[in-house]
A protein has these predicted regions:
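FAD-binding FR-type
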Residues: 5, 28-34, 38
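Short, amphipathic alpha-helical "lid/cap" segments that border enzyme active or binding sites
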Residues: 32, 36, 155-159, 205, ...
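A cross-taxonomic marker for long C-terminal extensions/tails that follow the last structured domain
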Residues: 203-222
Length: 222
């Protein structure tokens, strides 16, 4: 969005007429069949362990299309992976069609998760627990954010939960906070409210990683 143009525009005609004078679309519509076809056409380039990864945004927002694509790719013997925030109530329906399931675990405390993200973590925790029991290859990631989930008590909460769900099929990882989405917020004309306090140093990441490894869970860097 070009605010210099759009803020003074009253009719917003470009939205209906696809006029890109001040606003443009940053996506491309594709059919499920086209996605599967492109994957098949490029299969020779996948080499060892290659395939198709669905990420976001949040891929499960388009749940039925995602499910159809995953099923179609599985029928073609093409490996699939999905990165998800774990909030969709029907996520377990996708488990049979996903080769690698990657889920975020931002916080173990329901009230703090609600306060900072706007939604409860109950569905997320439930889906992670189910995935740990039902999916053959689950990778759980903690995006470490200063002032939100990087304290010692919060580390202990993570460790308690991870020990509960650990198994040969489950791996864990800590990721440093980043600002990859900042530009997207600015392009949409939204205020990016995260401050420098959200950044964590490498020592904090190492502290979490060391504690996880010593607790007996399988740590894996991606």
């Amino acid at each position: 969005v070009d605010r210099a143009i759009c803020d003074s525009c009253e009719g917003k005609e470009c939205i209906r007429q696809h006029d890109t004078k001040g606003m443009y679309l940053s996506y491309k519509e594709e059919t499920v069949e086209a996605v599967i076809g492109e994957a098949c056409a490029n299969e020779m380039m996948f080499y060892d362990g290659g395939g198709v990864t669905f990420t976001g945004g949040e891929a499960t927002v388009q749940f039925q299309e995602l499910k159809d694509a995953l099923k179609g790719l599985k029928e073609k013997d093409i490996h699939t992976a999905i990165e998800t925030n774990g909030t969709h109530p029907s996520l377990p329906e996708l488990f049979p069609y996903i080769g690698q399931l990657i889920m975020d675990c931002k916080h173990c405390d329901a009230s703090k998760h609600q306060r900072y993200t706007g939604i409860s973590n109950e569905r997320i925790m439930e889906n992670i627990r189910r995935a740990a029991k039902e999916h053959p290859k689950l990778h759980v990631r903690v995006p470490l954010i200063g002032g939100f989930n990087d304290s010692e008590p919060e580390l202990e909460q993570f460790l308690d939960f991870f020990r509960e769900i650990k198994g040969d099929n489950v791996t864990f990882e800590v990721l440093s906070y980043h600002e990859f989405g900042k530009k997207k917020w600015q392009q949409c004309g939204w205020e990016y409210k995260m401050t420098d306090e959200a950044r964590v140093d490498e020592a904090s990441v190492r502290r979490f990683r060391k504690a996880m490894e010593e607790s007996g869970v399988r740590y894996r860097r991606t």
